[in-house]
């Protein structure tokens, strides 16, 4: 089960299960629960097209329009398995675009929802619900909010129009393994994707058949990407490294060794001189390591933020004030809560210890290890083969003797 924290103007967006929560400055919360059975949801039946017909706007002629997980065309489903459906249809990917007040949410039932936040900042309006070919692994808006890119667990990336939001998606590019993160440069000329097979790929847009370069060097899955400046990219990997790249040339500029494999990172809004805080959530997420970014390709360790026994971090993010927010789960009960760590912006030190600013008492989010399966699996078939060969030779020798 996934959870997400995003900055949205003066609010903090927290999403998990099937609910999106907006936390205001005064810690008041308004929530929106995604319900596929709501009649007001504009449901689009056309699924995205792939390579051979990517220029087509719709594929409704070839699709039956069955809603995922129901086998029906009317959007209805069996309500007798609500608890199971809540888990199956939970939020699996999310992104926000402040310029156009948009929120994109992908759910486990292979749906992509596009929401608009009303001017009062307290209401979500459903613009569309579109079908995905596979379960999503990540979603990202372009800087201007004209479109969003959705990547799935099969390695394919699709482009979804946010202006003509009734259109199905169009296939852009594909990897040979699961895509874990995606970025779009501010000019919308390059798409950067990272995958489970240790690769970072820089692809031209909209001519995605042209690959600009690869950023190669990681030896495990690349879980997170962040822009640090023009042509400067930061990557986090399961090989226990942070790496800085010139993403137009594919050249590695610097690296930072970590004690544990990297899972997620959060980047504080950088100052004009490029300084700021970087928080890294590693595998076995009982602590967050905080670093100070110095210059364009360096960082120094500040401190580790540790939780009590029996608690784990699910995700992290910095708010508008530069404070670190951590979504914390009690392993024994699945009770989620939001913790805030306040930092001094001048010396980058922790100013206040963790304060749990919001508890979601009516919700449960069991902690699930979503990282261990990403590591490479090594199989030593030679020893098994040699053992079988030895036994076969011994049996043959006995028969001949």
UniProtKB/Swiss-Prot annotation:
State whether keyword Oxidoreductase applies: no
Per the record, GO CC terms? cytosol; nucleus; tRNA methyltransferase complex
Q: Which UniProt keywords apply?
A: Nucleus, Repeat, tRNA processing, WD repeat
The GO annotation for biological process reads: tRNA (guanine-N7)-methylation
Q: Where is the composition biased (Acidic residues)?
A: 54-64
**Where does the record place the region Disordered?**
45-85
Q: What SUPFAM superfamilies does the annotation carry?
A: WD40 repeat-like
The WD repeats lie at 86-125, 174-213, 217-255
Query: To which pathway does this protein belong?
Result: tRNA modification; N(7)-methylguanine-tRNA biosynthesis
Provide the protein's localization: Nucleus
Quaternary structure, per UniProt, is: Forms a heterodimer with the catalytic subunit.
Entry function: Required for the formation of N(7)-methylguanine at position 46 (m7G46) in tRNA. In the complex, it is required to stabilize and induce conformational changes of the catalytic subunit.
Q: Which family does it belong to?
A: Belongs to the WD repeat TRM82 family.
This protein is called tRNA (guanine-N(7)-)-methyltransferase non-catalytic subunit wuho
Organism encoding this protein: Culex quinquefasciatus
At the highest ranks, the source species' classification is:
Eukaryota, Metazoa, Ecdysozoa, Arthropoda, Hexapoda
């Amino acid at each position: 089960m996934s959870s997400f924290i995003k900055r949205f103007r003066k609010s903090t967006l927290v999403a998990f299960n099937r609910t999106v929560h907006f936390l205001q400055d005064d810690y008041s919360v308004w929530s929106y629960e995604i319900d596929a059975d709501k009649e007001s949801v504009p449901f689009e039946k056309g699924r995205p097209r792939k390579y051979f017909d990517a220029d087509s706007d719709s594929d409704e002629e070839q699709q039956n329009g069955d809603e995922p997980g129901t086998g029906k065309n009317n959007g209805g489903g069996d309500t007798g398995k609500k608890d199971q459906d809540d888990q199956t249809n939970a939020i699996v990917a999310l992104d926000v675009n402040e310029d156009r007040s948009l929120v994109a949410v992908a759910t486990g039932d292979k749906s992509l929802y596009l929401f608009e936040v009303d001017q009062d900042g307290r209401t979500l309006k459903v613009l569309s619900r579109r079908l995905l070919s596979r379960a999503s692994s990540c979603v990202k808006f372009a800087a201007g909010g004209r479109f969003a890119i959705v990547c799935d667990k099969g390695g394919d990336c699709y482009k979804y129009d946010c202006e003509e939001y009734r259109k199905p998606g169009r296939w852009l590019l594909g990897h040979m393994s699961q895509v874990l993160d995606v970025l779009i440069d501010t000019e919308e000329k390059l798409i950067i994707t990272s995958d489970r097979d240790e690769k970072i790929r820089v692809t031209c847009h909209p001519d995605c058949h042209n690959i600009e370069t690869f950023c190669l060097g990681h030896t495990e899955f690349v879980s997170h990407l962040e822009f640090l400046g023009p042509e400067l990219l930061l990557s986090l990997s399961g090989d226990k490294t942070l790496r800085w790249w010139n993403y137009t040339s594919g050249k590695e500029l610097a690296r930072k060794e970590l004690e544990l494999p990297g899972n997620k990172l959060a980047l504080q809004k950088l100052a004009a001189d490029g300084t700021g805080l970087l928080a890294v959530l590693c595998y076995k997420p009982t602590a967050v390591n905080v670093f100070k970014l110095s210059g364009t390709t360096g960082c120094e360790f500040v401190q580790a933020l540790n939780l009590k026994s029996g608690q784990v971090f699910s995700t992290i993010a910095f708010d508008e004030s530069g404070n670190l927010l951590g979504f914390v789960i009690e392993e024994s009960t699945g009770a989620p809560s939001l913790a805030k760590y306040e930092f001094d912006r001048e010396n980058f030190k922790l100013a206040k210890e963790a304060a749990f600013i919001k508890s979601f008492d009516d919700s449960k989010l069991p902690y699930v290890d979503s990282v261990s399966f990403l590591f490479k699996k090594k199989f030593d078939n030679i020893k098994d083969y040699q053992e079988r060969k030895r036994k076969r030779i011994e049996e043959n020798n006995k028969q001949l003797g």
